Amino acid sequence: MGAHLARRYLGDASVEPDPLRMPTFPPDYGFPERKEREMVATQQEMNDAQLVLQQRDYCAHYLIRFLKCKRDSFPNFLACKHERHDWDYCEHLDYVKRMKEFERERRLLQRKKRREQREADMAKGLGPGEVAPEVAL
């Protein structure tokens, strides 16, 4: 995500979303059939597993399963490689989804800026392909 942050500081910051804030566009904008992501692990399950706040994400149910396996087969730390793989893969897919959402937000902000610019040009009396007289000289 570093490349996105560099674009925010070096490029036009108005079309780069802030990664620390929630998206400004609704998640079903352009996708009327899109379902909302839901947590599989409940709050009570995460409390029982004593997960810290950073671990309470959409992959918490895989982490709970992995920690339980580690506890049950303690001396044999290699017995839980499948659970570890499932958790890592879920974290990877979650990261990819968040990057896609970030890119979607960036493109929607660019689209919004282009539309506002087009409306401002039309209000000035400039049609598509026309330039202002001071620019033409």
Swiss-Prot record:
Motif (Cx9C motif 1): 59-69
Stored InterPro entries: NDUB7 (IPR008698)
First-listed, main subcellular location of the protein, grouped into a coarse class: mitochondrion
Segments carrying motif Cx9C motif 2: 80-90
UniProt free text on domains: Contains two C-X9-C motifs that are predicted to form a helix-coil-helix structure, permitting the formation of intramolecular disulfide bonds.
Family label: Belongs to the complex I NDUFB7 subunit family.
Function: Accessory subunit of the mitochondrial membrane respiratory chain NADH dehydrogenase (Complex I), that is believed not to be involved in catalysis. Complex I functions in the transfer of electrons from NADH to the respiratory chain. The immediate electron acceptor for the enzyme is believed to be ubiquinone.
Official protein name in the record: NADH dehydrogenase [ubiquinone] 1 beta subcomplex subunit 7
Organism phylogeny: Eukaryota, Metazoa, Chordata, Craniata, Vertebrata
